[in-house]
């Protein structure tokens, strides 16, 4: 076992599995706005500023149609406005945790008065947001790039102001050693199975946060009400009970609430709340259905989240490939373990997942993401059950190879290569429909 990687795995988990209030792409805009207001020291006058927001094409795609927590609205303009009015610049991905009804009204008035403009920047960065604030004779601009809380530039009245705020060092450790350049899935599995429970027990926080979101979503007041619809039709007798229905409903419920702007944080994975949900809730629902022990649940969640990060490490931060599908591959691993599978079966489940849901597009963050999240959760259950029975998509089929790590690499080649043009086409359709 490569135990020298274990401290790095822990760092990766603590960096990439963190609470996030609201979809992380518009939240990065809100954070930049909050920091810019702080630079000018005009918190009490924030509703009187004008703002220019410039974002990468990918961030525009993921910010156009998603609910902003506590506002009842969607999109980047309200994210920028509410970030300026109510944002906590030291709270990272929970920048909007303290907003009030009066803050929301002030932010909406800013939009009504045309104080916020949003456009697409011609930049190489896949994840990029620059917010420039104008107040009387003063200006401040904040640029976030490459990671949702990574502040790369702050400018006040034409002068560079560095170093960046502490939020960067707290939430982004991208300069740290990357354990995944050396790691293989076997190493992820060994860590999840054998690391001391005292070192990894914190992963149960993902269960607490995302299960609370699920319960809220199942109330039937959010988004497309996918989770609530599944529960209702189970009660009608149109759907049977059992593991699959439980996983689908619990997972969809969390995503319903998340994508419709519930004022509750999700435990994210790789910078995405939906990916955190997809890596958490199928495992949680399965563990409860099987009456698994707390120890088993901890190890299954750690296997799921770290596998999701490992798979994502091969890919660009944002792409045309739906991140919920790759995160749910982590859940396939965790569920397989809960069903008494070992590394051979875990590998088989991931290969089958890639044979099933590879190529599902990301056409922006929105309430309909809950459909893709629940579909991916269903694929995770299906692949795990197949693996336990010794069945998998084989290395002669499509992009799936005999070796699981090669299969993961093949998926990344698809996402980082040919699907870049897919991304361009998706945004073009979205902007002109």
Curated annotation (Swiss-Prot):
Question: In terms of domain of life, where is this protein from?
Answer: Bacteria
Question: A GO term (biological process) for this protein?
Answer: L-cysteine catabolic process to pyruvate
Q: Name one Pfam family in it.
A: SDH_alpha
**InterPro entries the UniProt entry points to:** Ser_deHydtase-like_asu (IPR005130), UPF0597 (IPR021144)
Name any one GO molecular function.
L-cysteine desulfhydrase activity
Family per record? Belongs to the UPF0597 family.
What's this protein's name? UPF0597 protein Spea_0809
Instruction: Look up and give the organism this protein is from.
Output: Shewanella pealeana (strain ATCC 700345 / ANG-SQ1)
């Amino acid at each position: 076992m490569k135990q020298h990687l274990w401290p790095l795995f822990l760092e990766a988990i603590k960096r990439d599995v963190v609470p996030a209030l609201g979809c992380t792409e518009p939240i990065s805009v809100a954070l930049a706005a909050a920091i810019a207001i702080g630079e000018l020291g005009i918190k009490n006058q924030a509703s009187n500023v004008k703002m220019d927001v410039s974002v990468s094409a990918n961030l525009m795609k993921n910010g156009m149609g998603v609910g902003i927590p506590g506002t009842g609205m969607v999109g980047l303009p309200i994210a920028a406005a509410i970030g300026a009015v109510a944002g906590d610049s030291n709270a990272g991905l929970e920048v909007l945790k303290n907003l009030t009804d009066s803050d929301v009204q002030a932010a909406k008035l800013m939009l009504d008065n045309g104080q916020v403009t949003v456009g697409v920047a011609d930049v190489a960065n896949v994840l990029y947001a620059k917010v420039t604030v104008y107040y009387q004779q003063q200006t401040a601009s904040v640029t976030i790039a490459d990671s949702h809380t990574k502040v790369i530039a702050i400018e006040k009245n034409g002068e560079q102001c560095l170093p960046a705020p502490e939020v960067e060092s707290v939430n982004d450790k991208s300069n740290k050693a990357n354990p995944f350049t050396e790691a293989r899935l076997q190493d992820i599995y060994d860590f999840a199975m054998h690391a001391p429970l005292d070192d990894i027990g914190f992963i149960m926080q993902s269960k607490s946060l995302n299960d609370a979101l699920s319960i809220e979503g199942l109330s039937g007041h959010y988004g497309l009400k996918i989770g609530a619809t599944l529960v209702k039709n189970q009660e009608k007798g149109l759907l049977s009970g059992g593991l699959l229905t439980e996983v689908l409903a619990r997972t969809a419920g969390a995503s319903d609430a998340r994508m419709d702007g519930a004022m509750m944080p999700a435990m994210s994975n790789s910078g995405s709340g939906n990916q955190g949900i997809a890596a958490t809730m199928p495992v949680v629902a399965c563990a409860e259905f099987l009456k698994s022990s707390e120890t088993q649940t901890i190890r299954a969640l750690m296997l799921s989240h770290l596998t999701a990060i490992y798979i994502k490490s091969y890919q660009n931060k944002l792409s045309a490939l739906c991140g919920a599908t790759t995160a749910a591959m982590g859940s396939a691993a965790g569920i397989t373990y809960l069903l008494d599978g070992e590394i051979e079966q875990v590998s088989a489940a991931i290969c089958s997942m890639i044979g099933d849901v590879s190529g599902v597009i990301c056409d922006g963050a929105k309430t309909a993401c809950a459909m893709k999240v629940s579909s991916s959760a269903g694929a995770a259950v299906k692949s795990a059950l197949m693996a336990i029975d010794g069945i998998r998509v084989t290395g002669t089929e499509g992009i799936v190879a005999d070796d699981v790590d090669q299969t993961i690499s093949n998926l990344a080649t698809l996402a980082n290569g040919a699907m870049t043009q897919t991304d361009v086409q998706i945004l073009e359709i979205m902007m002109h429909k």
